[in-house]
Regions:
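Nucleotide 5′-phosphate-binding alpha/beta core
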Residues: 1-115, 121-138, 145-146
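Short acidic, glycine/Ser/Thr-rich loop/turn "cap" segments at secondary-structure junctions
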Residues: 120-128, 152-159
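Conserved ATP-dependent adenylate/AMP-binding module captured primarily in the ANL superfamily
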Residues: 137-154, 189-194
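Conserved adenylate-forming
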Residues: 2, 45, 52, 64, ...
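Positions that flank functional sites
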Residues: 76, 159, 188-190
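Short glycine-enriched loops at secondary-structure junctions
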Residues: 110, 133, 160-163, 187
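Conserved AMP-binding loop of ANL adenylate-forming enzymes
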Residues: 145-173, 177, 181
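Catalytic micro-motifs at enzyme active sites that drive phosphoryl/nucleotidyl and oxygen chemistry
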Residues: 103, 160, 192
């Protein structure tokens, strides 16, 4: 089953045959030119979606003279789409708390709240919608599949479980793959619940 829709919709019951090398054979083996075309089409979809659903991006892009209809190549994306800086995101969150006006789903659809690691001073929180959470799970499951992990395997997730998204992505990917998950993050050895 190849899933190309936008916004993404995932069949979370889907699993390739256990002996399959690829999660999505067509997508993972396409020739470079075809892959670049597929990436460009997805970038067009994503930028149109952000333009229509996130005032932050529309405003930033209008200020830079960019419109999603101007994307004709991957080079256009690199040359025309302005860079978003951490300060831009923090300013947006100050103007429109708690997540800013760059989130592309309504507040009622936010499924998880995570954040950056805080390397620039303080973590920046962000909301993740259900469809995005499913996309994260499927991306991690696909990566694990390519490493030879299969349903029923035990996956040891040795990472810090905090606001930072990385460990949660690995955990949800292993769960999506129907693995037994063993989350084990940093911290003291004393029980946290009495």
């Amino acid at each position: 089953m190849e899933q190309w829709s936008f916004p993404p919709q995932f069949d979370n019951a889907y699993l390739p045959p256990a002996d399959a090398r690829y999660w999505f054979p067509r997508r993972e083996t396409m020739p470079p030119g075809e892959r670049e075309h597929a990436i460009l089409e997805r970038l067009k979809d994503v930028t149109r979606y952000a333009w229509n659903h996130a005032p932050f991006y529309r405003r930033k892009w209008e200020e830079a003279g960019f419109h999603p209809d101007q994307l004709r190549s991957l080079e256009d994306f690199e040359a025309k789409v302005p860079v978003v800086h951490k300060k831009d995101l923090r300013d947006a969150q100050s103007r429109v708390p708690p997540f800013g006006d760059y989130v592309c789903v309504p507040d009622s659809e936010i499924h998880h709240i995570h954040g950056t690691s805080g390397t620039t001073g303080r973590p920046t929180a962000f909301g993740i919608g259900r469809a995005d959470w499913d996309a994260i799970a499927n991306a991690h499951a696909r990566i694990m599949w390519s490493m030879g992990i299969r349903p029923g395997d035990t996956v040891f997730v040795a990472a810090i479980f905090s606001l930072y998204m990385g460990s949660w992505g690995a955990m949800t990917g292993a769960e999506r793959l129907r693995c037994k998950t063993f989350p084990f993050g940093a911290g003291g050895c004393q029980p946290r619940v009495g």
